[in-house]
Every structure is written in C-alpha cells, then in structure tokens.
Amino acid sequence: MQASRARLFKEYKEVQREKVADPDIQLICDDTNIFKWTALIKGPSETPYEGGVFQLAFSVPEPYPLQPPQVRFLTKIFHPNVHFKTGEICLDILKNAWSPAWTLQSVCRAIIALMAHPEPDSPLNCDSGNLLRSGDVRGFNSMAQMYTRLAAMPKKG
C-alpha cells in the first residue's frame, strides 16, 4: 500500500504542474482519501460533446498501479461505450490492456479520445451503439448533443 500511496502522491504533484499544460483535464484528489479522485474533462472539439464538461469518479485500488482504477462518468452522457445509468466505461486500458505505465492523467486523455472515436461494436449503451452501427450518425449526434446540453453545460439564467 505504501508503493501505491507514493505513486499517487507523485501523480498528484505532476497534476499540479500539468494544470496549465492540459486545460482540458482537471484532476482533483479527495482531501481525506488519496485513493478517491474526481476529474473534470472537456468534451472534445468537433464532437457532439463539444462545450460540455464531464465529471468522472476514480476509485483507485490499493495494488495500484498494478491494477487499473475504476472510473465512471458522474455526468450523464450518450455514448456507446458508457453505461447510461451507471456511468461505467468500456475501455480496454481499464480492463485487460492496463499497464502500470498509465497514470490517472493519461487515463483521462484516453477517455477523451474514446469520446471522439466511439467503438459501437462493444457497446454498454446499445441504443447509441445501434444508431452508429446502422449509419445514423445524425441521430446519434442529435441525442449526444441533447444530453450534453442537458447534463454537461452550465445552466443559463
């Protein structure tokens, strides 16, 4: 457990240095538990998520970095690789393709890349996956933009 705490503390210091370098990601460590983190990520440009800010919850296991963190969306998102109700993310690096070389920051970058390039053939949200697999990109974009407006954009007024 000491090794994982040391690694997370190192990542925490790195995140403090990276704040200006990577304005699309804001990682925040829980004040009382270094194994709990949240992230705010900006929706990638030229996607239906553009303009949205999405909150992620990280639960880091004690054997980290030998085991991947559990990550889920707290913000509702219409995406084939994200379970609509639980926010669970289907991403290989969070499962069998994990490597200790990954950091919480690089996991956020991978999630942003997944947002820009969905994998409709391994869906956790079948409705959005079916829209993309059937070629209805317009329908998918419309739904994704609607949920981005409703859940990931600041309310006006």
UniProtKB/Swiss-Prot annotation:
TM helices/strands, residue ranges: none
InterPro entries documented for this protein: Ub_conjugating_enzyme (IPR050113), UBQ-conjugat_E2_core (IPR000608), UBQ-conjugating_AS (IPR023313), UBQ-conjugating_enzyme/RWD (IPR016135)
Record's GO cellular component terms: peroxisomal membrane
Membrane protein topology class: Peripheral membrane protein
Pathway: Protein modification; protein ubiquitination
Record SUPFAM superfamilies: UBC-like
One GO-annotated biological process of the protein: peroxisome organization
Cell location: Peroxisome membrane
Entry keywords, A to Z: ATP-binding, Membrane, Nucleotide-binding, Peroxisome, Peroxisome biogenesis, Protein transport, Transferase, Transport, Ubl conjugation pathway
GO molecular function, one term: ATP binding
Main subcellular location: membrane
Active site: 90
EC id: 2.3.2.23
Record-annotated UBC core domain positions: 3-153
Reactions listed under catalytic activity: S-ubiquitinyl-[E1 ubiquitin-activating enzyme]-L-cysteine + [E2 ubiquitin-conjugating enzyme]-L-cysteine = [E1 ubiquitin-activating enzyme]-L-cysteine + S-ubiquitinyl-[E2 ubiquitin-conjugating enzyme]-L-cysteine
Enzyme class: transferase
Its biological purpose: Required for peroxisome biogenesis. Necessary for the developmental elimination of obsolete peroxisome matrix proteins. May be involved in the ubiquitination of PEX5, targeting it for recycling. Accepts the ubiquitin from the E1 complex and catalyzes its covalent attachment to other proteins.
Family statement drawn from the similarity comment of this UniProt entry: Belongs to the ubiquitin-conjugating enzyme family.
Self-association and partners: Interacts with PEX22.
Name assigned to this protein: Protein PEROXIN-4
Organism: Arabidopsis thaliana
